[in-house]
């Protein structure tokens, strides 16, 4: 089984800090890393064998790059910003060894790049300014869904491309329903 040694402790600490800032006093915050992962579904103990370890979701979300690639040899996440000329990318995020290429880190590196060109809205909610509108929500959902619904056992990786006039989100896998049902 995949163990705590396969976990990127920095990612878990950052997640814990993010959860604490968004939901102070959340009951999951009182647990150690293993307990937190258990509550999130990232750690599992087999009640019949007693074996325990990281789940696939826990590994993908918070794992070390090497451990993820060992479990998923074709794992690759890639963000590219393509200029108007259509030539080679001008900004890119991919597993280059400078960061742990788990889904948590990828999302937090890529989301600011995806959202920075979007127009800012102004709304007050509970006396707090909120700059994100419906387009921000839709793109954040598209990014999250691309990562969550990828078939990491499949061939090919997650690729997010930001063009001057559109975004392309692609991942390995297929629709679980027919195209007729989808449309």
Model-derived regions, located:
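Active-site helix-to-loop segments that bind/position phosphate- or nucleotide-bearing substrates
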Residues: 1-156, 161-183
């Amino acid at each position: 089984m995949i163990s705590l040694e396969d976990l990127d402790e920095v990612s878990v600490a950052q997640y814990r800090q993010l959860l604490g800032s968004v939901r102070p006093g959340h009951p999951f915050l009182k647990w150690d890393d293993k307990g937190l992962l258990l509550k999130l579904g990232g750690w599992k103990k087999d009640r019949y064998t007693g074996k325990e370890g990281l789940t696939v979701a826990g590994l993908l979300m918070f794992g070390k790059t090497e451990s993820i690639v060992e479990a998923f040899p074709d794992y690759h996440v890639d963000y590219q910003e393509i200029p108007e000329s259509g030539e080679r990318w001008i900004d890119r995020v991919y597993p280059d060894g400078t960061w742990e290429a788990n889904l948590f880190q990828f999302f937090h590196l890529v989301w600011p790049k995806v959202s920075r060109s979007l127009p800012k809205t102004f709304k007050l909610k509970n006396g707090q300014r909120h700059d994100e509108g419906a387009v921000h929500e839709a793109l954040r959902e598209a990014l999250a869904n691309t990562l969550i619904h990828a078939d990491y056992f499949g061939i090919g990786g997650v690729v997010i491309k930001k063009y001057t006039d559109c975004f392309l989100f692609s991942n390995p896998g297929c629709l679980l329903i027919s195209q007729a049902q989808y449309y």
